[in-house]
From Swiss-Prot:
Name under which the protein is recorded: Putative uncharacterized protein YLR334C
Organism: Saccharomyces cerevisiae (strain ATCC 204508 / S288c) (Baker's yeast)
Main localisation: membrane
Localization per Swiss-Prot or TrEMBL: Membrane
UniProt membrane topology term: Multi-pass membrane protein
Alphabetic keyword roster: Membrane, Transmembrane, Transmembrane helix
Gene Ontology cellular component list: membrane
Transmembrane segments: 4-24, 42-62, 64-84
Length: 126
């Protein structure tokens, strides 16, 4: 169990680093992104980053769920072309055997490739 906790902490740190890098990339690529966001809905220029972080946390924690159901994700801001996820439901508890067989980083990256963060179509280019 101690090995799982150590591995989990390392994966969580990687996820946090990935979050920060992804947020900075989005902001640097499209400075105009801040003007395009609306505060009245599920605002996410960082939805993929946060999703990566959450999935990593739930997958590496053997006492918490890691089965994710996306309910109409990434479809709210179609006009501004931002990807959004408004509902994540955790449904299954992992046991030790599943934990040892699961590869969270690879799986999450595959998930994020299906739902990339897109920049605004009227973005300013440097």
């Amino acid at each position: 169990m101690d090995n799982l906790i150590i591995a989990g902490i390392l994966l969580l740190i990687k996820a946090m680093i990935f979050c920060i890098v992804n947020i900075l990339e989005v902001l640097l690529e499209d400075i105009g992104i801040l003007k395009s966001l609306f505060l009245h809905n599920a605002i996410t220029i960082i939805s993929s980053s946060v999703l990566y972080f959450l999935l990593s946390y739930y997958i590496i924690n053997p006492r918490i769920s890691a089965s994710i159901i996306f309910d109409d994700c990434f479809s709210i801001f179609m006009l501004s072309s931002y990807t959004v996820c408004d509902d994540i439901l955790i449904t299954r508890i992992l046991n030790k055997q599943m934990m040892l067989q699961f590869h969270p980083i690879r799986t999450i990256i595959k998930l994020l490739q299906h739902f990339p963060v897109k920049s605004s179509p009227n973005a300013h280019t440097a």
